[in-house]
């Protein structure tokens, strides 16, 4: 008398269903992308309420002022040189108002701007001519690309 053992058939069905060891039977879809964790940093304001920070622009470190009143990132001529933008080769054809009057600035795109662990790529910026700006301002062309920023109790929080 012959007894049929269903176990080998069940095992084969499970292997075929899962596609174990059979690459042609696996789903063709790419795996789901990894979930990005939110980056956040908190910056204490100075006694005058301003937020001076160390930033990395195109991987070069500079000092800057976070300025919600500035419509764009504005780099001083000297800082533009430090971060490798070659300001002497730029075209200064954009009129901008500064505390010292109207000057012509050059449009640039920054590959990367980082403040602590908060990073933003492809940031529009302006380079001001030599002597027109004492330091770099990180304005709204940077801040608006963040998921949020807020000032509370003398601390500015940036999230991305």
Language-model region placement:
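Pepsin/retropepsin-fold aspartyl endopeptidases
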Residues: 1-63, 68-160
């Amino acid at each position: 008398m012959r007894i049929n053992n269903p176990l080998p058939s069940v095992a084969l069905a499970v292997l075929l269903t899962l596609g174990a060891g059979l690459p042609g039977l696996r789903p063709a879809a790419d795996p789901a992308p990894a979930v990005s964790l939110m980056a956040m940093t908190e910056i204490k304001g100075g006694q005058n309420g301003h937020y001076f920070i160390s930033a990395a622009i195109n991987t070069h470190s500079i000092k800057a002022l976070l300025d919600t009143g500035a419509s764009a990132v504005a780099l001083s001529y000297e800082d533009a040189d430090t971060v490798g933008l070659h300001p002497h080769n730029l075209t200064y054809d954009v009129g901008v108002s500064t505390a010292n009057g109207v000057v012509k600035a050059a449009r640039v795109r920054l590959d990367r701007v980082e403040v602590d662990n908060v990073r933003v790529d492809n940031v529009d910026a302006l380079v001001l001519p030599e002597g027109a700006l004492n330091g770099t301002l990180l304005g709204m062309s940077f801040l608006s690309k963040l998921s949020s920023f807020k000032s509370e109790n003398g601390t500015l929080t940036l999230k991305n």
